[in-house]
């Protein structure tokens, strides 16, 4: 970490500024961490993990970040099931019948 980059403690986690964004680390020394671009979203993500809530309408990367930061097995299983459900669903593609294909 370079000199002058900030570090903040929030609800049992450390938010450290890196060159490309922020790193959230569990304060207990276990080494669990994840990387996020925005400091405000870091705090929201920590709130979700501490309160055991599943973040709405987020990418699989964010859900996996919640798994990395949490130590609650029920919470981890709930998010893992959501990720698996998303992977099993097929993406519905739009087909324009009037467009000519060559």
Write out the residue ranges for each language-model feature.
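Short arginine-rich
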Residues: 48-59
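Short N-terminal "domain-start" leader segments
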Residues: 1-23, 71-80, 84-98
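A short, exposed loop/beta-hairpin motif centered on an aromatic-Gly-Thr core
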Residues: 26-45, 49
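Active-site-proximal or metal-binding-adjacent scaffold patches in catalytic folds
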Residues: 66
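Intrinsically disordered, low-complexity, compositionally biased regions/tails
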Residues: 16, 25, 33-35, 55-57
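Intrinsically disordered, low-complexity mixed-charge
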Residues: 101-102
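Short amphipathic alpha-helical segments that mediate assembly, nucleic-acid/protein binding
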Residues: 39-43, 59-63, 72-81
